[in-house]
């Protein structure tokens, strides 16, 4: 047992392993990279529309800063983005990143669906058996309307006319698939 002044320290009873705190060293470069990543997250938030911003869990102060940055230009916008990055450093950004990722993923899913519909439309026009297969898979589809549109699109294609029925098939397929 060691004594020091008025304070008594009992060395035998002290468990050094429990009292040691882990010190995590972070390099200056890593801090800068993290700050830059948060600034880029702030830029993504500033580029969103007001409707999309409402779907993301943001603190009031951060939301006000983002709305202000949307109105600013040039150097003032750059300074405001720095400020948004600073605000993001003080909060947990994981829920914000998750919500932003969901919004971006939803857009990609919509693009993929539209691409599939375009391919289906082309298949329906080029292959007469594809209409029968489509109608077997989707018995709720309007058989007569779809066949008429396909015939009209084939006729337009043969006569080099503007693709009015071609667009109507896409719109019909899009409306039909969204109902399901």
UniProtKB/Swiss-Prot annotation:
Disulfide bonds: none annotated. Belongs to the DarP family. Signal peptide: none annotated. It is found in: Cytoplasm. GO terms for cellular component: cytosol. Keywords: Cytoplasm, Ribosome biogenesis, RNA-binding, rRNA-binding. GO terms for molecular function: ribosome binding; rRNA binding. The gene is darP. This is Dual-action ribosomal maturation protein DarP. The keyword RNA-binding applies.
């Amino acid at each position: 047992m060691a004594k020091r002044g008025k304070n008594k320290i009992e060395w035998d009873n002290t468990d050094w392993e429990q009292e040691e705190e882990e010190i995590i060293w972070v390099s200056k470069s890593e801090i800068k990279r993290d700050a830059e990543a948060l600034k880029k997250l702030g830029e993504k938030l500033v580029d969103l529309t007001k409707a999309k911003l409402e779907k993301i869990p943001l603190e009031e102060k951060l939301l006000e800063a983002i709305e202000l940055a949307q109105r600013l230009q040039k150097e003032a916008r750059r300074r405001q983005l720095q400020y948004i990055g600073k605000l993001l450093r003080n909060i947990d950004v994981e829920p914000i990143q998750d919500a932003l990722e969901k919004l971006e993923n939803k857009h990609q899913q919509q693009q993929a669906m539209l691409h599939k519909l375009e391919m289906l439309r082309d298949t329906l026009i080029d292959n007469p058996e594809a209409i029968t297969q489509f109608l077997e898979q989707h018995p709720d589809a309007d058989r007569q309307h779809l066949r008429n549109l396909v015939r009209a699109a084939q006729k337009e294609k043969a006569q080099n006319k503007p693709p009015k029925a071609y667009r109507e098939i896409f719109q019909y397929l899009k409306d039909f698939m969204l109902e399901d």
